[in-house]
Amino acid sequence: GRGQKLSASAVKEVALANNIAVEQPVTFKKSSAEGLAARQTLRTYQPDVMIVAAYGLILPIGVLETPTHGCLNIHASLLPRWRGAAPIHRALLAGDDETGITIMQMDKGLDTGDMLYKVSESIASDDTAASLHDKMAALVATAISTVLKDLAAYQAQAIAQNDSQANYAEKLIKTEGEVDWSQPASAIERQIRGLTPWPGAYTFLAGQRVKVLASL
């Protein structure tokens, strides 16, 4: 959070307020005592299904196979386009006019699992990464509840991804925010919107770093 202070996520706050147990494993690796303990804790819940969204850990196959119906991932793109860590930002940077949400059955690959459900969202000419994130977040509750209400049917009709159509949304790094003024104006405009709020576009003026908040 602000001031580099740790704060609970909204999900954790709601769970604690309703006396729902919260587990926050730091690893699932078999090579560590913490990882083995986390796997054992997961098994004690005997989960029917797990839902994963923007989770920071790689889930090994042993974890993916623990729930009766496996693990579902809510991914912020229309797979197989923009697999990976930063699909919203990369869609904006590339000038895509549409993106969306995909609910997929997780496997050992990186966003490579079979697709159960997709819903599209148009990208407006003034969308930033922040505004597009919020528009897509509004789609998630309906999407995942729709799938869970008839999970067996959606899993039976799951569609395999076409790997030949896949591309990857690489994780953002801060230096991507520096504006290269030799680029076309359209590319710079997308850079400003696609990197708002983080890492943010910037340039240097008289030796000083200056934030670029918008284009005209």
Features from the language model and the residues they span:
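One-carbon transfer enzymes
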Residues: 1-197, 208
